[in-house]
Amino acid sequence: CGGVDAPCDKDRPDCCSYAECLKPAGYGWWHGTYYCYRKKE
């Protein structure tokens, strides 16, 4: 699975259970890449 800060596909997210696939705020957004971020819980 994809760990924190790993690129992911918003349609087929493969992030680990502790992470979620989100659109970056700031860097990276202009080329449509999503990244795995640690869940807020």
From Swiss-Prot:
Give the protein's function: Toxin that causes irreversible contractile paralysis in adult Aedes aegypti resulting in 100% mortality after 24 hours.
Name of the molecule in the record: U-theraphotoxin-Lk1a
Disulfide pattern:
C1-C16, C8-C21, C15-C36
**Localization per Swiss-Prot or TrEMBL:** Secreted
Q: Which GO terms describe its cellular component?
A: extracellular region
**Domain text:** The presence of a 'disulfide through disulfide knot' structurally defines this protein as a knottin.
Entry's InterPro entries? Toxin_22
UniProt record similarity statement: Belongs to the neurotoxin 14 (magi-1) family. 08 (Ltx-4) subfamily.
- Note one Pfam family from the annotation: Toxin_22
Organism listed in the record: Lasiodora klugi
